[in-house]
Amino acid sequence: MKAINIALDGPAAAGKSTIAKRVASELSMIYVDTGAMYRALTYKYLKLNKTEDFAKLVDQTTLDLTYKADKGQCVILDNEDVTDFLRNNDVTQHVSYVASKEPVRSFAVKKQKELAAEKGIVMDGRDIGTVVLPDADLKVYMIASVEERAERRYKDNQLRGIESNFEDLKRDIEARDQYDMNREISPLRKADDAVTLDTTGKSIEEVTDEILAMVSQIK
């Protein structure tokens, strides 16, 4: 098969990262977790006491993705591995706000385009098919019900030892959907040439197989 790029977009907790990792593994491609980039910048934003000088924040930031056999993708922020700090509730609650800022978006998108230049990339996010990889060979827009997404987030939090309330998670996801879809810069939307894939009630294996079937149709 020729070298291709695959873009997976969709709202929070639609299963993008989990599926992207699986697809990349099955196809011996490289998975790029763009959300982790925004989470890393949000982590720094919080460490800087919620600075509003986002241009200065990114100007004074180095951000790299590395791969370790025991951990998979690791995020190196200012020469520190911050991977284990990026899924806490504080980062999750602020990441949409930070990611909506133009200096942050420009900084991350530039990095993402550089990573995808050689092809062989599976990338997931909110604006991959529309902004980062508009020429991706396959674009999939993943959706799922709010209830299912809240359940996934609840289970993920349990595995990480993070206490959470199911109803609060539902409200947070609904609020984030509205914020992501209505933000001025790179709003969440389906690319015109993307395939919609509803993952509600489907297993990881089922969704992975559906995407692999799409890949097999690429000429």
From Swiss-Prot:
Swiss-Prot/TrEMBL keywords: ATP-binding, Cytoplasm, Kinase, Nucleotide-binding, Transferase
Top-rank taxon: Bacteria
Compartments, record wording: Cytoplasm
Binding site for ATP: G10, P11, A12, A13, A14, G15, K16, S17, T18
Gene3D superfamilies noted in UniProt: P-loop containing nucleotide triphosphate hydrolases
EC number: 2.7.4.25
GO terms for cellular component: cytosol
Catalytic reaction(s) noted: CMP + ATP = CDP + ADP; dCMP + ATP = dCDP + ADP
Gene Ontology MF annotations: ATP binding; CMP kinase activity; dCMP kinase activity
A Gene Ontology biological process term: pyrimidine nucleotide metabolic process
Annotated Pfam families: Cytidylate_kin (PF02224)
Family: Belongs to the cytidylate kinase family. Type 1 subfamily.
Protein name, per record: Cytidylate kinase
Organism name: Staphylococcus aureus (strain MW2)
Taxonomy of the source species: Bacteria, Bacillati, Bacillota, Bacilli, Bacillales
Gene encoding the protein: cmk
